[in-house]
Amino acid sequence: MRSAKLKFEKRRSRIRHKISKTSHSVRLSIFKSGRHIYAQIIDDSKSITIAAASTLDEKIKKLKKSHCNIENAIKVGEEIAKKADSAGIQDVVFDRGGYKYHGVVKALADAAREKIKF
């Protein structure tokens, strides 16, 4: 039987492979730790990070002690959308990074969808 970590890694690699086959070269990547949530807009053709936001940003960090929750995920989504808009990015591919599209991942995606299209 596969361990949970191995299942997660397989799911992550399957998602990344599907994304790499698309014509879009810019993706919105999500990472969750036990305490924080991170979002990056990455240009895979140039291998650079265009914009990044997380619960470690000073604006969001002041709000609550527990940082990886839906309220802060919405704030991170709004912040990454603002940074993408200022960088001139309108269209991205959403990379959920192996996480289920539920809870904080869904909240971040819905908040980011207000300004960027994916």
Swiss-Prot record:
- Gene3D superfamilies the UniProt entry points to: 3.30.420.100
> What is stated as this protein's family in its record?
Belongs to the universal ribosomal protein uL18 family.
User: Keyword set for this entry?
Assistant: Ribonucleoprotein, Ribosomal protein, RNA-binding, rRNA-binding
**What task does this protein carry out?**
This is one of the proteins that bind and probably mediate the attachment of the 5S RNA into the large ribosomal subunit, where it forms part of the central protuberance.
Mind telling me what this protein is named?
A: Large ribosomal subunit protein uL18
Instruction: Tell me the domain of life.
Output: Bacteria
Metal-binding as UniProt keyword: no
Q: How does it assemble?
A: Part of the 50S ribosomal subunit; part of the 5S rRNA/L5/L18/L25 subcomplex. Contacts the 5S and 23S rRNAs.
